[in-house]
Amino acid sequence: MDIEAYAVKNYVPLLATFETEALYKYVQKRYTEILKKIPHAWVIGGFDDPFLIPPDSVPATSEILSCLDTNIEKMWIVVTKGPNGPFGLVAEDLGNDKFRGFFTIDSKIIEKVIKIINNTMRIEINFSKE
């Protein structure tokens, strides 16, 4: 089961980052359905086109944000909430279809990643709330 499927099955929040608009467009239909089935989502990407994701296709419980020109832009992150706190995948896009990263169920590590994203983006991603 992938992280997104876990979020849907367990009705828990989801954080997903995409390096480029093209990578989001590849999964856009799938994500449009996922966002309707979870309590909250943060979708962050190197989005340059403000009309990439039509507002009427996104539930009010979802936040779509651009991380263009930040240190998050080259990151592929997918996080959800498990019984012991957040868990997920954190990877850096090295180019040429190569990534460097890790999957962890250690909530302290994921919470540190979320803190960096919150500080960089000046937002509040909080998996304690549903």
Predicted regions and their residues:
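PLD/PLD-like phosphodiesterase catalytic module centered on the HKD motif
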Residues: M1-E130
